[in-house]
């Protein structure tokens, strides 16, 4: 929906505020570079960056992170891809319920959702006690099957099958962590996918789209 990572933008802003453990923040960016360079797997990168993110924000009040997230979003909201607002309206017009699931922290995912008027949104959830982050992670959608877990938690169900019309649902994703959702819906769309997801999409016969074609593609598949 927006170039880059909102979660990493949040980390950068925390550091500029003099918040967060710098050694853990630096390690997060280093692990991402290692994964992109083929040194470690995607799942190993997610596991390590999740641990590091939780450690980086340990001891920070949740209200402070929410304030920083709002500042980050204020500076990034203009970078939303032009298709995003029309896409949300198209989804609603077809009688579908828009839901956002992201691996970024829910504090900033909520900013995105509020901007789009989307009531159902999930992000990574870090442990809190007495209004302060504890250094643990309760939910990471980027983990294997993590986005399915996030959807179940968001919708308050033990299983999506039977609670959601999966065959009548559409999912859009670009990361390997999105595959667990794409493979269970009736209309999966790989949007400008990373190479691993592109290969999977080709093998499964899923639609592959990009920012220039997406609205036309949605108009076709949701007709």
Over which residues does each language-model region extend?
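A metal-dependent, Asp-based hydrolase signature
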Residues: 6-90, 97
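Asp-based phosphoryl-transfer active-site loop
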Residues: 1-9, 182
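Amphipathic alpha-helical interaction elements
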Residues: 2, 37, 54-57, 110, ...
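C-terminal cap/substrate-recognition subdomain and adjoining C-terminal extension
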Residues: 68, 74-223
């Amino acid at each position: 929906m927006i170039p880059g990572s909102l979660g990493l933008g949040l980390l950068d802003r925390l550091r500029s505020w003099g918040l967060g453990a710098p050694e853990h923040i630096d390690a997060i960016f280093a692990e991402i570079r290692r994964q992109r360079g083929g040194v470690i797997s995607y799942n190993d990168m997610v596991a390590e960056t999740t641990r590091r993110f939780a450690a980086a924000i340990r001891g920070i009040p949740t209200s402070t992170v929410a304030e920083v997230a709002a500042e980050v979003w204020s500076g990034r909201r203009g970078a939303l891809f032009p298709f995003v607002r029309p896409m949300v309206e198209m989804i609603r017009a077809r009688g579908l319920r828009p839901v956002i699931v992201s691996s970024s922290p829910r504090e900033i995912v909520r900013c995105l959702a509020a901007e789009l008027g989307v009531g159902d949104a999930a992000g990574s959830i870090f442990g809190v006690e007495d209004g302060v982050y504890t250094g643990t992670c309760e939910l990471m959608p980027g983990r294997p099957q993590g986005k399915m877990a996030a959807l179940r938690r968001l919708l308050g169900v033990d299983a999506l099958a039977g609670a959601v019309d999966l065959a009548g649902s559409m999912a859009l994703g670009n990361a390997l962590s999105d595959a667990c959702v794409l493979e269970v819906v009736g209309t999966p769309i790989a949007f400008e996918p990373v190479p691993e997801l592109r290969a999977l999409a080709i093998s499964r016969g899923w639609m592959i789209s990009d920012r220039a074609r997406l609205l036309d593609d949605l108009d076709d598949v949701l007709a």
